[in-house]
Amino acid sequence: MEAEESSSSVVPLPQDVQSVVRGGFRCLLCGVNIPNRPSLTDHLSGRRHVRLHEERDKRNQQQERSVYVSNFPRETSEEQLRDVFQKISPVRNIVMDKDRGLYAIVEFESKDGMCAALEEPQIKLSGKRLRVKPREKKEFQRKKGGSPRTLQPPDPEALSKELLNCADVEQQIKKLVSLCSPSHHESHLRELLLSLLQETFTEFFPGCQLLPFGSSVNGFEISGCDLDLYLDLGDDEAENVEGKAEKEIQNREESSTDMEVSMEDPETERKEEEMEIGNSKNDEDEDVTPGLSLKGLSSEEILEVVGKVLRHCVPGVHGVQSVPTARRPVIHFQHKTSGLRGDVTLNNRLALRNSSFLRLCSDLDARVPQLVYTVRYWARVNQLAGNPFGGGPLLNNYALTLLVFFFLQTRNPPVLPTLVHLREETANEVPQVIDGWDCSFPSDPAQVKESGNQQSLSSLLSEFFSFYASLDLHLLILCPCNGLTIPLPFSSPPPAWSEGFRLGPLNIQDPFELSHNVCGNVSSRAARRFISHCAAAARICRTPNYNLHSTSHPWGITPILLPPPTERECVGRGGTEISIPLGGVSPEKTYAAVSKVFVDVLLCTLEEGREDSCQEGKALELSTKHAKAQCKVEKNEVGGELGEQEVPCKAEQNNTKEASKQKSIFKTEEGMTESARRKREMTEPCMSDMTNGKKRRLEFTRGIWDHHLATSAMEEEMCGEAHKDSKTKIDYSNNGTAQWELLVWHRVWEGRRKERRRKQKGEADGVELEIAVSQALALEKEDKCDGPLMKLILTAQLTVKESLQLYLTPKFDPQGLSSTFFHFLESYLPRMVAQIQGCGDPV
């Protein structure tokens, strides 16, 4: 009865929302997944959903009161069509096919006007009968980014070919800067467009100034970058705009969708865009005339007026879209002839000062822009930055630039001085205060002393990636103003600016507006990807190929700048990373637990990294008393010192050393504890049921397993002394990084829950149960292959914040099994390690 009442009280889902099989909901309108009901309620009332809902309703209403008109002379004007249809019913808007003049969309004030036009038997223009039919109703879709612009930096493939011909890494970086910088022709186009816009705005707003900022002027201009413009309307108008805007900004919450608007492709969607722009008001009835007075208007109204001037009075400008809800209200536009895109803001004097500061830093040391260009391109290729709509969860170019600045400030000696140091050096400068923030710094680079740092570009780039891979960024605020970090949470009392500072997974304080987190929009996933890609790039920079010139394969910065392979290009090639918390346990014991899971539980084989599969230096060195005792047992029989994880896996090794291996196992078996014997007895019935085809492979696995059972037996007998005097350590000379080859022999991750339920009826528990499950699954699965199913590269890195970071990358995966194996490991491995260490619940 209670179930019936609860089911009847469930609120029905809106038509735009559907339930997801695995739980949660999906908003079809916004294209996002929502985990639960409270989040769904928040989403439905959120700005993005409401905006799209209103936009869809508006589009549907347009379609219902519009007709499609064709068969008119090519020279027909909009006014002529308006005169014809105005006689039938009041016309709201007309959009014509200006390119070819083949059709027009006529929108009436009401649906009755559309019906009246369709009922007219004959509608003529200049004696020619017009074809009038209902407008085709298209399903509403969220706007997506338009087609790529012709003005773009080189693609990674073309760039890599150019970089291969360079002599060293420094030349590669300089070549990258040269290829990404805009050409003289593009720079000239920007100047012409700026002049055209200035001339137009001056006509309508006498005394105004149009000032460029951002990448166009800060020394880090890239081909195809947007033209950022600040429209200064004069003292009176600026005070009117900025005073009201600041109040709105204080009450406006930043979000990743603040500027999430689209710039539609002009050739395919321009007609629909123009219809939308004109839907709210008839622009013909609201003339935009020169000499406008903006006094008394709100910031949104002024933004709307400026948008109309752009839309109707600047030749070649289209796709004009106002975003009054952004942190800094902005107008996006495109210029068809030049292919440039631009943004106009009305209250962004702080951005002008920011751009001047970036320009100063760019001029102080030639290495600064070269590193910024390289890091920006790296982030773009790896999809870490470059939000296509101005907002979004990724890093922006300004944030990347500040990351480079902060890194250069922390070198010894610093490559760049901090802003605080610059102010101390030039105390005689006139103070610059904008919106209450101190924006003072030297105006002339000659006033600043040269840096004493003589590091090469290749060294600095390598250190950049290692630096950020080693930081726990979610627990720090990076402050480029003074070159320091602030640990989180704030100490008491917190700094004055902390009240408005929006904390997130990545925190970079704006050097001037101290309460602004430049990375406030960055999502947790984007922050994690940034750190993992930094770690991957750092590993590449530590390989010999980084500084070793080659004409046959990528070297230097080329491997860093190549995009990762897509899923279509190589199924299962994508790797994964798994974090194992140390939890107060030593790194050596944590690694031993990880090894036990892979080898004992999952029946895999671990081999030390070799030169062909590990170019990054030394592997983990195991030299405990435990290992020495084990080596004494096996020294003569096996013919070499077999460490804990050094297990032979090749067929010839199996054949030549089988007798000695069995002898070794026999010797150590006498020292087994009762616990180890129980492990052995659990698997013997399974072994007796093997078929001949499986026996060879599983006998080898059994040999490995018996070898480690004997090892664990010795551990139990020696646990006190062995751990007390342990010398096991990770080789920190390679930044605490080690690498092995992991061979996967059996698909023991498939059907594991079912088999575990079956085995739980017995006496086995914990790790013993998991081993029994794997043995049973290995017998059941028919993996008909002579070699391993997969070969993976396992990299372990000890992080600063008490965790062991594991990276698994497929090396050989013909069946594409690695993706499902990785998915299984992401939750299974940390839980099993915690259980082995005695601080976790059974799996």
Curated annotation (Swiss-Prot):
<feature type="binding site">
    <location>
        <position position="215"/>
    </location>
    <ligand>
        <name>ATP</name>
    </ligand>
</feature>
<keyword id="KW-0863">Zinc-finger</keyword>
<feature type="domain" description="PAP-associated">
    <location>
        <begin position="456"/>
        <end position="516"/>
    </location>
</feature>
<feature type="binding site">
    <location>
        <position position="226"/>
    </location>
    <ligand>
        <name>Mg(2+)</name>
    </ligand>
</feature>
<keyword id="KW-0862">Zinc</keyword>
<dbReference type="GO" id="GO:0016180">
    <property type="term" value="P:snRNA processing"/>
</dbReference>
<dbReference type="GO" id="GO:0050265">
    <property type="term" value="F:RNA uridylyltransferase activity"/>
</dbReference>
<dbReference type="Pfam" id="PF03828">
    <property type="entry name" value="PAP_assoc"/>
</dbReference>
<dbReference type="InterPro" id="IPR013087">
    <property type="entry name" value="Znf_C2H2_type"/>
</dbReference>
<keyword id="KW-0547">Nucleotide-binding</keyword>
<dbReference type="InterPro" id="IPR035979">
    <property type="entry name" value="RBD_domain_sf"/>
</dbReference>
<dbReference type="GO" id="GO:0005847">
    <property type="term" value="C:mRNA cleavage and polyadenylation specificity factor complex"/>
</dbReference>
<keyword id="KW-0808">Transferase</keyword>
<feature type="binding site">
    <location>
        <position position="516"/>
    </location>
    <ligand>
        <name>UTP</name>
    </ligand>
</feature>
<feature type="binding site">
    <location>
        <position position="228"/>
    </location>
    <ligand>
        <name>Mg(2+)</name>
    </ligand>
</feature>
<feature type="region of interest" description="Disordered">
    <location>
        <begin position="241"/>
        <end position="292"/>
    </location>
</feature>
<keyword id="KW-0539">Nucleus</keyword>
<feature type="region of interest" description="KA1; binds the bulging loops of U6 snRNA but is dispensable for terminal uridylyltransferase activity">
    <location>
        <begin position="564"/>
        <end position="837"/>
    </location>
</feature>
<comment type="function">
    <text>Poly(A) polymerase that creates the 3'-poly(A) tail of specific pre-mRNAs. In addition to polyadenylation, it is also required for the 3'-end cleavage of pre-mRNAs: binds to the 3'UTR of targeted pre-mRNAs and promotes the recruitment and assembly of the CPSF complex on the 3'UTR of pre-mRNAs. In addition to adenylyltransferase activity, also has uridylyltransferase activity. However, the ATP ratio is higher than UTP in cells, suggesting that it functions primarily as a poly(A) polymerase.</text>
</comment>
<comment type="similarity">
    <text>Belongs to the DNA polymerase type-B-like family.</text>
</comment>
<feature type="compositionally biased region" description="Basic and acidic residues">
    <location>
        <begin position="241"/>
        <end position="255"/>
    </location>
</feature>
<dbReference type="GO" id="GO:0005524">
    <property type="term" value="F:ATP binding"/>
</dbReference>
<feature type="compositionally biased region" description="Basic residues">
    <location>
        <begin position="134"/>
        <end position="146"/>
    </location>
</feature>
<feature type="binding site">
    <location>
        <position position="354"/>
    </location>
    <ligand>
        <name>ATP</name>
    </ligand>
</feature>
<dbReference type="GO" id="GO:0140767">
    <property type="term" value="F:enzyme-substrate adaptor activity"/>
</dbReference>
<feature type="binding site">
    <location>
        <position position="354"/>
    </location>
    <ligand>
        <name>UTP</name>
    </ligand>
</feature>
<keyword id="KW-0507">mRNA processing</keyword>
<dbReference type="GO" id="GO:0016607">
    <property type="term" value="C:nuclear speck"/>
</dbReference>
<dbReference type="GO" id="GO:1990817">
    <property type="term" value="F:poly(A) RNA polymerase activity"/>
</dbReference>
<feature type="region of interest" description="Disordered">
    <location>
        <begin position="134"/>
        <end position="157"/>
    </location>
</feature>
<keyword id="KW-0067">ATP-binding</keyword>
<dbReference type="InterPro" id="IPR054708">
    <property type="entry name" value="MTPAP-like_central"/>
</dbReference>
<dbReference type="GO" id="GO:0008270">
    <property type="term" value="F:zinc ion binding"/>
</dbReference>
<dbReference type="GO" id="GO:0005730">
    <property type="term" value="C:nucleolus"/>
</dbReference>
<comment type="subunit">
    <text>Associates with the cleavage and polyadenylation specificity factor (CPSF) complex.</text>
</comment>
<dbReference type="GO" id="GO:0180010">
    <property type="term" value="P:co-transcriptional mRNA 3'-end processing, cleavage and polyadenylation pathway"/>
</dbReference>
<keyword id="KW-0548">Nucleotidyltransferase</keyword>
<keyword id="KW-0479">Metal-binding</keyword>
<dbReference type="Pfam" id="PF00076">
    <property type="entry name" value="RRM_1"/>
</dbReference>
<feature type="binding site">
    <location>
        <position position="226"/>
    </location>
    <ligand>
        <name>UTP</name>
    </ligand>
</feature>
<feature type="binding site">
    <location>
        <position position="398"/>
    </location>
    <ligand>
        <name>UTP</name>
    </ligand>
</feature>
<dbReference type="InterPro" id="IPR043519">
    <property type="entry name" value="NT_sf"/>
</dbReference>
